Amino acid sequence: MLSANVVYELQTVWFPNMTDAGLGRLMDLLESGSPLLIHGCFTRATPMGCLATHVGWHHPRTEHMVHEAGITWLTRVAGLNPATSAVIREWDYRGPHDWRLRSDLLDVLKAEQQSRQRKSERAAKRQPDLVVV
């Protein structure tokens, strides 16, 4: 189970700064147990990166970066200190081989994706129909 601090940081800092593409990428990597998702460093060799790096590679402000995408996304986009980020600390401590961590993160990511889809559907319903005169 994820700690309350990790869930809070995801919901209040990561998700508001994460693109749909970044969210989808993390979900794909976690679901497949991909070796491209690493821990202990931001980037080992492209395309291997940590959570923040894969999010950074899918964000318009940092997608052009290679090795610096994760740290730059985390510090300049999300406004977090990598040394004190609850998400990064938990990921680095437990790592991608902890199936429970992957499963718990995936559950939170899926909930966010569903929330975004519901908001998008509600917004689409609010769009007034064009009236032809």
Regions found by a protein language model. Give the residues of each.
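Short, glycine-biased loop/turn motifs at secondary-structure junctions and
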Residues: 1-133
